[in-house]
Each structure stands twice: as structure tokens, then as C-alpha cells.
């Protein structure tokens, strides 16, 4: 239920040993999730208004980097605000305030209007978060007011305690130039091959895996996390900075909006008509580790 702290209200969800806190004012993100007192997500830094590197948030109406913050749509060029060097990153909802539509003991629904001064087509994004004793279910939907391209994803920041293992069942990833995906694919190999569930260790990855099969699996010394996604298979970004790591299920590859129309659709972008919707779901479920960690 709503709880107070310095600054805007947060929402606390509780289901048995599982506890999650949502922060509507900071991107509608899951600010924390703990099971049996064990925290899974990176917590907020002191400057939570400007930091992207914590919690778990929805990326919409596009995920990941968009080269030069620009794409073509309906015969016009849409120029977005550049938020990551020369590029626009992670959509328009991660750093804005979401409205709280409903909240119960273990579930909440939030929504946000896409700002027309940055996204001329308008529209809105809705998300529902449901908690159980051993799972966190995340659902999101983009609704179009008029014809528009759409994609979404989630960006969880996981704690890296105990040198966890990560299994991603994908045989290819998207080639990048200057950290921006190009649309070309390469076979996984070396440190990029996560199919056997290796330890993250010193791997420094920032890759969009293609057609990843559900679920991805994280194994800490005492806990296993299964990241299931619907629909599947999907593009799945793995990012491994020092001290944390991210496993990001997406409905389209990063930079897909910048591709030509046919390639854009092949990369997963949905072209919505007025009143149409794009939805997706992620189910994070935990269980005791089997001993392999």
C-alpha cells in the first residue's frame, strides 16, 4: 500500500516473504524487490532523479539506444531529445512520473501519457505489477492515439553478489558500431556465448541477443531467478557493468526505429493504427539454487 518517505509517495507490495516497492515519480519503476530479505535489484542512489542505473523500469515507446535520436515516420523526420551522448536512450517513460491507477496489497496499475512535444503521435503506456511469494509479474501495454511505431521492454538492474551464472538460450547477437546496433547478426562465441550458463565473472557485455528463448536464468549462490517473457523468442539485451548486470527482454531490437520500414518490422517494431495496442509480459520467479552455483 502507499507509504511515505521524503519526496513523492512510493507503493509497497507484500506477498508472504516477497516485498516490492514501486516509485511512480521516478519512472514508475520497481525500486526494490526482496524475497526472504534477499534483495535482487540495485537500489536507488542518492541522486535518484538523474540516475538510470537502478531498479527495474519499462522502456517505451522504444527500448535501448536510438541512433542520433532520429527516425522517419509517415513522411516526416521525428527528432527526439538526445539523452545519451548523440543518441536517445530507453524511451520516454523511465524518467517521468506515472499516475497510479489502482493499488492493492500485492498488485498495482500505473499509466503515463507519451508527451506530444517529444513524441508527436501521442499515446499512452500502462503497466501492471503483481507480486506473489516467489514471483514478480510485469505487464506493459502501449496504446496508440494515431498511427505510430511502437516497441517496449524492461530494464532490470540486478545485484552481482557471489559471481552469479547467467544462461541465455540464443545463438546470435546483433552487431554494433559505436555501441549502436546495425541490424546485422553474428554467431555467439567466446565470452558472448551464454547458452551453458557460465559465470558472469569478468565478461564485459553490452549485446542484443536475437531470438532468445524463454526463460533466461540467473543463479546466485543461494537463489535461482528465471526470467520468462511473453511473447517469445525475443531480443534480449545483456549488459554487465562492474557491480551489477542487466537482462533486458524487449519486443524489438535497440535502434530498430532507425531502420528502413521493412527492416524495422523484421526487427520487431509494431506499426500500430489508432486505438491499437502492443503488449508484453515478463515473469520473474525465484527458487532456492540447485547447488550448481
Locations of the language-model features?
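Acidic-aromatic substrate-binding/catalytic surfaces of carbohydrate-active enzymes
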Residues: 19-77, 245-246
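Glycine-rich active-site loops that engage anionic ligands at enzyme catalytic sites
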Residues: 220-255
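Acidic, contiguous internal or C-terminal segments within carbohydrate-active enzymes
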Residues: 13, 20, 24, 112-160
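Active-site/ligand-binding surface loops and adjacent short beta/alpha elements
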Residues: 149, 157-231
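Extended, loop-rich substrate-binding clefts of extracytoplasmic carbohydrate-active enzymes
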Residues: 1-5, 76, 81-133
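Short, Gly/Pro- and small/polar-rich lid/capping loops
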Residues: 1-16
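A conserved acidic, glycine/proline-rich C-terminal tail/linker
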Residues: 247-269
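Short Pro-Gly-centered flexible turn/kink motifs
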Residues: 71-79, 140, 270-287
Amino acid at each position: 500500500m502507499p507509504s511515505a518517505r521524503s519526496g513523492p509517495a512510493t507503493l509497497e507490495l507484500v506477498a508472504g516473504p516477497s516485498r516490492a516497492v514501486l516509485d511512480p515519480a521516478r519512472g514508475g519503476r520497481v525500486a526494490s524487490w526482496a524475497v526472504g530479505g534477499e534483495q535482487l535489484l540495485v537500489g536507488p542512489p542518492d541522486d535518484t532523479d538523474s540516475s538510470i542505473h537502478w531498479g527495474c523500469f519499462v522502456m517505451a515507446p522504444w527500448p535501448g539506444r536510438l541512433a542520433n535520436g532520429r527516425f522517419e515516420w509517415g513522411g516526416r523526420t521525428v527528432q527526439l531529445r538526445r539523452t545519451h551522448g548523440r543518441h536517445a536512450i530507453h524511451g520516454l517513460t523511465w524518467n517521468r512520473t506515472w499516475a497510479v491507477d489502482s493499488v492493492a496489497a500485492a498488485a498495482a496499475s500505473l499509466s503515463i501519457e507519451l508527451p506530444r512535444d517529444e513524441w508527436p503521435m501521442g499515446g499512452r503506456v500502462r503497466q501492471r505489477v503483481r507480486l506473489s511469494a516467489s514471483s514478480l509479474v510485469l505487464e506493459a501495454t502501449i496504446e496508440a492515439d494515431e498511427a505510430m511505431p511502437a516497441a517496449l521492454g524492461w530494464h532490470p538492474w540486478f545485484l552481482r553478489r557471489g559471481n552469479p551464472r547467467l544462461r541465455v538460450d540464443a545463438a546470435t547477437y546483433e552487431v554494433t558500431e559505436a555501441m549502436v546496433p546495425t541490424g546485422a547478426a553474428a554467431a555467439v562465441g567466446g565470452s558472448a556465448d551464454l547458452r551453458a550458463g557460465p559465470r558472469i565473472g569478468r565478461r564485459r557485455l553490452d549485446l542484443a541477443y536475437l531470438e532468445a528463448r524463454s526463460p533466461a536464468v540467473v543463479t546466485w549462490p543461494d537463489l535461482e531467478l528465471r526470467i520468462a517473457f511473453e511473447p517469445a523468442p525475443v531480443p534480449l539485451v545483456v549488459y554487465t557493468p562492474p557491480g551489477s548486470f542487466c537482462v533486458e527482454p524487449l519486443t524489438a531490437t535497440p535502434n530498430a526505429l532507425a531502420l528502413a520500414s521493412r527492416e524495422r518490422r523484421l526487427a520487431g517494431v509494431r506499426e500500430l493504427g489508432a486505438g491499437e495496442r502492443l503488449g508484453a509480459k515478463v515473469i520473474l520467479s525465484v527458487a532456492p539454487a540447485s547447488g550448481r552455483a
